[in-house]
Curated annotation (Swiss-Prot):
It comes from Arabidopsis thaliana (Mouse-ear cress). One of its GO terms (biological process) is pollen-stigma interaction. The lineage of its organism: Eukaryota, Viridiplantae, Streptophyta, Embryophyta, Tracheophyta. This is EMBRYO SURROUNDING FACTOR 1-like protein 6. Keywords: Disulfide bond, Signal. The keyword Metal-binding does not apply. The gene is ESFL6. The keyword Cytoplasm does not apply.
Length: 77
């Protein structure tokens, strides 16, 4: 492999590192947002399962934090 090919490959690999960090950061932001409108608890229908429920309406529970945040944000605003 010539030095110019190696340099191009190196630049491409280095440029992918911030994208990886950005993808990981999205999950953390969603958890921060979710903690303001949803709480983690046992599902009302299935006590052994864990769900995310709206703070304002505890009967609205979802297995996905993203779904809970989407629905509960509409209830708040």
């Amino acid at each position: 492999m010539s030095p110019s090919h190696f340099a191009i490959l190196f630049i491409i690999v280095i440029s992918l590192v911030p994208l990886h960090g950005y993808a990981n950061g999205q999950g953390f932001d969603a958890n921060k947002l979710g903690s303001s409108v949803c709480h983690l608890g046992k599902c009302p229908k299935h006590r052994e399962e864990v769900c995310y429920c709206c703070f304002n309406d505890r009967s609205r529970c979802y297995r996905s934090l993203y779904k809970c945040v989407a629905v509960c944000n509409r209830l708040v605003h």
